[in-house]
Structure formats: C-alpha cells, structure tokens
Amino acid sequence: MSEKIHPVPKQVKAQALIDKEKYLKWYEESVENPDKFWGKHGKRIDWFKPYTKVKNTSFTGKVSIKWFEDGQTNVSYNCIDRHLKTNGDQVAIIWEGDNPYIDKKITYNELYEHVCRMANVLKKHGVKKGDRVTIYMPMIPEAAYAMLACARIGAVHSVVFGGFSPEALAGRIVDCESTFVITCDEGVRGGKPVPLKDNTDTAIHIAARQHVNVSKVLVVRRTGGKTGWAPGRDLWYHQEVATVKAECPPVKMKAEDPLFILYTSGSTGKPKGVLHTTGGYLVYASMTHEYVFDYHHGDIYWCTADVGWVTGHSYIVYGPLSNCATTLMFEGVPNFPDQGRFWEVIDKHKVNIFYTAPTAIRSLMGAGDDFVTRSSRSSLRLLGTVGEPINPEAWEWYYNVVGDKRCPVIDTWWQTETGGHMITPLPGAIDLKPGSATVPFFGVKPELVDNEGKVLEGAADGNLCIADSWPGQMRTVYGDHERFIQTYFSTYKGKYFTGDGCRRDEDGYYWITGRVDDVLNVSGHRLGTAEVESALVSHNLVSEAAVVGYPHAIKGQGIYCYVTLMAGHEGTDTLRQELVKHVRAEIGPIASPDKIQFAPGLPKTRSGKIMRRILRKIAEDDFGALGDTSTLADPAVVDDLIANRQNKATA
C-alpha cells in the first residue's frame, strides 16, 4: 500500500475553486446542517418553481429519499436553454469519431435545435411524460440528444450500453416496459461495425415473447450499412427530424419526477433498474463536476466513458452541460489506430481535464511510454480516474508520464447508485496518496462497520457504509422498492451499504479494497457472478457453474469459471471456446470468461451451499490456507480443483 504523499502544487492551489480551508468549512456545514448547506447549493441550477423543502429522507422502515421535493425544474433547460443568451455560440459537444480524421463540433445553439427536434419526434409518435424510452446507441452526439430530448418532455430514459447482447437489451426493455427504442444502423468501434439495429430487432422479438411490444424504433444512420427494416415500426431519424419544428418548450418537472433508469449488476443475477430523479441528481452531478474537476469556464473536458454507464450520464452529459462546459464525446477505443490515440486526441482538441478508467491506464502503460511522449499533452492540467481502485504503480505512471508530474490525479470513488462522486480529492484542497480515493465530498458521511454492524473509529478496515442521504442518491429499484431496501439498507440497519470493503488510514484517507459481495468489477464495469453463472448453465452441456473474480493485470478483476458438465461429456479446448462465445452472446463481450476450469464437482457444504471462499482462493492460486473446510460434503473435490487449476503461477 503506497504511503507516498503528493502535496497540492502551488500553481494548482493558486487557481483552485476550493482550497483546504474552504473544504473543511463547507464539509463541516454539509454534514452538520445539510438543510442549510444544500438549501444554498441547490440554487446552482435554475428552478421554475423554487423549493422550500430541502431534505426529507429516511434510511429506516420503508426508506424514503426526497430532496427539493416541492421545487420544479427541467434538466434539459438547465443543460441548454439557460446558456443560450450568453454562450449560445460556445461549443457544447466535441465529437471525435472512431476514425481519427472525422470529428465535429456542436454549439449550444445547435444542441438546442437538435434536442428540440428529437423531442418533437418523440411527441409526434405518442411519447408522453413518464413513458420509458430505451436508448441503445454508440458514442455519437445523437445519444446525448436522445437523453436530453427525453428529459425535455419528461420521458424516462433507459440507456443500454451498445456492447450488450440482444438478450441483455431485451431484459432491460421488458423490465421497464419500454415501447419506444432509439438506436442506429451500426456502431463503429476500432474500425469494426457493431450491428446495433440487428441486435435491436432480435431484442424486440425476445421482448414480445414476454408480452412487451415495442411500437416504434427511431434509427440514426451512422454507417449506411444494411439492416433489417419493419415498415410502420421503424423510422429514420434524419427523415423524422425534417418534419418537425426546432422549438419545443421544456416540461415543468417536479424535483422527484424520474429522470432515468440505468441497469446495474446485482448479486442475484437479475440486473437492477437504478432510478434517479430530476432535481437532486442534477444539483449533485453539476456540483461534483465543477468542484472535483476544478472546472473553469472555457476548459475543454474529456471523460472517456460510454453514455451506457453512469459515468457517461453524469460526467459526459448532465454534469458538464449543466455547467456550460465543452464536453468531448469519443466514439473510438484507446488502442485504435494505435495505443497513442488518447494522447493524440488530447493534443488535437487541447484537452485540459481528462477522466478515464484504471483498466485503460494499465493497458496503455503496458504499451510503453513512447506512445505517450510522442505527443505534447501540454494543455492538460488535471487527470481523473473512475470505475475501480487504481493501483499505486498505475497512479504514478499516469502522474509522471501522462501528466508530466504537474497534473493532480483525482481518484474518484462512486457508484451507479450514488449519482456522482462520493469519496474524492478536490485538487486545490487535498494532498494525494497514490491508490487512495482520499476524503468524502460535501454532504457524504462515510462509516466503516464490522460484520456485526459495529461502527469502527479511527484507522480501521471494514465494510463501507454511508450514514446519511445526499441529493444524488438513487431513489429506488425501478418497480421493486422492496429489493432496494433489502439490497442497500438491510445489512446494516439505518445505513446505506455500498457493497465495498474499505480501509481508513491514520490520516482519515479512505482506500477502497473491492467488492465484498458477489459482484465482479471487470475493467471498471460491474457484473454479477450470478449473471455469468446463469449464462453458462443455459448451455446444454453444462450442469453447474460457479464464477469468481481473481486479480487480473489489466482488467483489475478477471472472470474465473468453474464448470461441471453433464454426465458423459469431456471438457475440451473447443468446448472452452464455445462456452466463451456462448457467454458473450448471452450478456456481451464485457462478460467474456478469462479462465474456464472443468470440474467434476464443486465444493459444497452438507446443506448444498457452494463455498465460494474456497473457489476464490484456488482462482487466486493461493490455497495454502483455505480456512475451515470441515463442513464440506466431499473434501476430495477441493484436491481435484487445486490439481487442475488454470492459474498456476507456482510449481
């Protein structure tokens, strides 16, 4: 664990919005008197009807979370209209295509027109306030237009990552009963086409079998590639927007009206629809974007995430645009045409603030420094990381090589459920320790508790909980409030349980140690082990499967699968490849197994429970101390698993 400290550099402190003194003062007020603090900072967005109530939350009983509840606003208005008078000609979105020679710039005035037209197309086809619209798009500006158009008319968007399979897309369409889908003919990633429209068609057939019928599909033409077409259902975006006006008044939304649903992996296998509402979410996304990235007007800001993840929602679209920023949207991948792409884009567009994932940093670090140093990167002044803890070696490389030892590295810990940053340094206020997410953001009260729920004081290792609500917090699991209570509030009564383990050091800095539940963090993306297990078991030769994570040099966590086959079948390399393909088809490439070990049996207790602790140890090639195995029904199973492990690092 690194204990090296990087103090706040003088030049950073000199221009920062928040210094140490202000951080301490504001933080104290935010936790001692949240009504007063958020009552003041809620005014950073425009309200049609000002709120008089600030915080109305309870983490016990039925669990109810309401912020600014009697206020009325509109997210699209705050991200576009309010900037037009003074900054209409400023660039809102820089789009950098997969092909390095293709890019475009969209001003706030142009963004207004695009969003109003798309909103009018939705209205023309019967989409109303409260209806759910599924967005299955690549990283093109139309994805942002679609989100903002939904927000403008009060429709609830559900963005599904373009790398997910038709089956995963169908499950998300069915869960929120969405009848309108926005997609495009094909996406492009690393020079290769992605069949989004064909995937959508397949997903719609699967959804129809579950009695959810999609009535309209709006299709953006990206490549001009051939796709299936259903006349009467499918609509070309370019034809539709030509038939409507470029004016659409924003609907007055209550602060607690839903803004979006975003599905995230749970430990039970069925993805959870995380529901975020309008007012509190936008206040929090906007405020964290400004202070965590020390955003100054005129900065060029680039977050490399996909809009299919919460990072894309909060820190490509809503946070930056609400702050009248110029936000860069990147369609491509870090290693196409080669591993220098990120750094070339930074030079090309004079990027000042750069936010990416540790998994990308580790893979680019492995490619060598030359790809970085052949670019100037002189425009950079701040680097950020998101998605998983960053190991100190990758942190130092990012700081020394990418940032030339002059850009603070802002390691942000947060979740789909939190809406925005929770534990993070503020660049002008907090000395940095490589590998630590450092200290809580305003209004965030972290607590470490032991397995019995006892709150630990001082330097300690424990389960990370949050003791009180903050405005960006999710409000419920869509359609299943009981699951919301059970998942987040039943383990430690009266506290929000994050599912993460954490260490607090003697300086009060927080170090995230990883998931403590059955959720994997693969390349910064959450995947439930149960999802991967059920995908494996759906193959006709598999009788049983257990999935665990193990340390992976690039992805952070790899996916290790133990598979028991139907009687009479042998495990072969061909079958291994077939199972990898099968999982990719069921969930998407993100869930590709890294290791598959064929096993005659799994270690179970006499009551039939799989002992995952043992499977984790074997996957980590660390089986010297397996702990208590006395409850195993068949101890010989373990010897076989050890002998045939796929991760032999030792003789």
Curated annotation (Swiss-Prot):
Record's comment on post-translational modification: Acetylated. Deacetylation by the SIR2-homolog deacetylase activates the enzyme.
An example Gene Ontology biological process: acetyl-CoA biosynthetic process from acetate
Gene Ontology molecular function: acetate-CoA ligase activity; AMP binding; ATP binding; metal ion binding
Function recorded in the entry: Catalyzes the conversion of acetate into acetyl-CoA (AcCoA), an essential intermediate at the junction of anabolic and catabolic pathways. AcsA undergoes a two-step reaction. In the first half reaction, AcsA combines acetate with ATP to form acetyl-adenylate (AcAMP) intermediate. In the second half reaction, it can then transfer the acetyl group from AcAMP to the sulfhydryl group of CoA, forming the product AcCoA.
Catalytic activity: acetate + ATP + CoA = acetyl-CoA + AMP + diphosphate
Binding site for Mg(2+): V537, H539, V542
Coiled-coil boundaries: none
InterPro entries hit by this protein: Ac_CoA_lig (IPR011904), ACAS_N (IPR032387), AMP-bd_C (IPR025110), AMP-bd_C_sf (IPR045851), AMP-binding_CS (IPR020845), AMP-dep_synth/lig_dom (IPR000873), ANL_N_sf (IPR042099)
Listed GO CC annotations: cytosol
Alphabetized UniProt keyword annotations: Acetylation, ATP-binding, Ligase, Magnesium, Metal-binding, Nucleotide-binding
Cofactor(s) in the UniProt record: Mg(2+)
N6-acetyllysine sites (modified residues): K609
Residues annotated as binding CoA: R189, G190, G191, K192, T311, N335, S523, R584
Record: residues binding ATP: G387, E388, P389, D411, T412, W413, W414, Q415, T416, D500, R515, R526
Keyword flag Signal: no
Protein name: Acetyl-coenzyme A synthetase
Enzyme Commission number, as recorded: 6.2.1.1
Similarity section: Belongs to the ATP-dependent AMP-binding enzyme family.
